[in-house]
Every structure is written in C-alpha cells, then in structure tokens.
Regions:
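Rossmann-like flavin
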Residues: 2-110, 185, 189-203
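Short, conserved active-site loop motifs that form the nucleotide-linked donor/cofactor pocket
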Residues: 128-129
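A conserved short coil-to-beta-strand element within the FAD-binding core of flavoproteins
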Residues: 132-145
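Core beta-strand elements of the Rossmann-like FAD/NAD(P) dinucleotide-binding domain
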Residues: 156-165
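Glycine-/small-residue-rich beta->alpha transition segments that form the dinucleotide
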Residues: 169-174
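Short, compositionally biased segments
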Residues: 216-219
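Single conserved hydrophobic/aromatic residue that forms the stacking wall/gate
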Residues: 221-224, 228-230
Length: 230
C-alpha cells in the first residue's frame, strides 16, 4: 500500500500539542522543540483556511477544514463555552486546546495521502524506483555497518546492497519490528527470539502510546449530514 497509514487513516490533521514537543527538547532531544519543528510543519502543508504566520501555504500536502456546518455543531460549541472550553478556530495554530472544526487531509474529495502529496508528483524520475508487493524482512550488517536489506517480493527473497544510506520509514509498528528482526533492540527481547544482537538499544519497540478518543452519540430530530467535498 503506497502511502502507508496515511492511505487508510481517519484523515484528521493534527500537529500535536506544543507542550509535548517542548517537553521532548527539555528532556534532551535537541532539535525537537515546537519552534524547531514548526518550519517543517509549514513547509509540508498547503493550508486552505485563514492565513497565519504559523501555517504553510505552499507545501505539497493540502489541508482543509470540514465544510459541513450542521446546526447541531452550534449547540455543541455553545455547550463547550458554558463549560469554559474555548472555541478554537485553528487548533494547529497558536493554541491547541479548545473545540473547533476538524482539519483534514482531503482536497476536492480526494484523500491527500503521503503518496498523493509526495510520491505521485515525482514517480517518473529516472533515479527513483518504486517496488510494490514487497516486505522488508530485515537490515543486513557487516559488523556495525548497515550494508543492505533483505526483502520478500511475492515469494522471492531478494537482498539489496546500498552504497550510501537507508531511510527506515515503516511507521510506529513496522520500523521497530524491522530493527528488532535486524538485531537492534532490547537484549532480552532478541535473545528470547534467538535473534543475534547487533546493537543493544533499549528504547526500540517500547513505550508505544495512542491518543484517547472518547466517542459520544446524540439523537436529534434535525437532519444530519456530512460531506467531505472540499
């Protein structure tokens, strides 16, 4: 599946809370403060809403606000304000807290996946080869140096050698899985699976967290509809 999880996710575009990034930087992750990553957020997006110095306008990824303005939403906003929850017109802007309309990676009715935004425009380049129906099994090492990768293509195992670098972008699940299968990770985990240890790195495969997403259901005599024809 080209585009990875961006081709199957819920299409909601959320940068994350500024405090989280700043906390990472305070913990020693230099270069991960919100001010550090903001230029990259701006560079990647083409925001179709109100302009702001915090939003990008010329990036490859189209970001839109849901166009549906059901009357029910006005009641939700009013209820939130009565509970002292502020209405936030852009939760990817100055403040991240509050209630507001969802921003999505949808443009003119089409999902704006990483494949649509980044890969499709350049797939005709002569120095780019896209191999589908393939699964990376593990990285190949000569001592501590990564020299290639083992790939399963349909029913064949193929070894690819590299002369420069490998960028591992398998996502929150597959990236640590590939590292562990390659011998990089917690010693006890690898020994349990009889995987030779290349590099002990205790953080690999640990501390995965997902966001909280409470669901609510309401009943009304009003006609409800939803459209994503942005």
């Amino acid at each position: 599946l080209l585009g990875g999880s961006s081709s199957i996710n819920g299409l909601v575009y959320v940068r994350g809370n500024k405090l989280d990034y700043d906390t990472w930087a305070q913990m020693g992750n230099t270069g991960w403060s919100y001010d550090d990553v903001l230029p990259f957020f701006k560079k990647m997006e083409s925001y179709q809403g109100d302009t702001s110095e915090l939003r990008g306008l010329e990036g490859p990824l189209k970001v839109t606000e849901v166009s549906d303005r059901n009357p029910i939403y006005n009641g939700l906003f009013k209820a939130a304000e009565e509970m002292q929850i502020p209405v936030n017109k852009d939760y990817n802007g100055q403040d991240q807290e509050g209630i507001g309309y969802t921003q999505t990676t949808i443009y003119k009715g089409e999902r704006m996946s990483a494949e649509v935004a980044y890969l499709r425009p350049i797939k005709s380049r002569k120095n780019l080869t896209i191999i589908t129906n393939s699964l990376v099994k593990k990285l190949l090492f000569d001592g501590k140096k990564c020299i290639g990768l083992e790939v399963k293509n349909k029913n064949k195992i193929i070894n690819y050698s590299v002369s420069k670098e490998i960028i591992l972008s398998g996502g929150a699940i597959n990236s640590p899985q590939i590292l562990e299968l390659s011998g990089i990770g917690r010693r006890d985990v690898l020994e349990e699976k009889n995987i030779p240890l290349i590099q002990e790195l205790n953080g690999v495969g640990e501390n995965l967290r997902d966001h909280i997403a409470p669901r609510t259901v309401s009943y009304t005599h009003l006609r409800a509809h939803e459209t994503h024809e942005h």
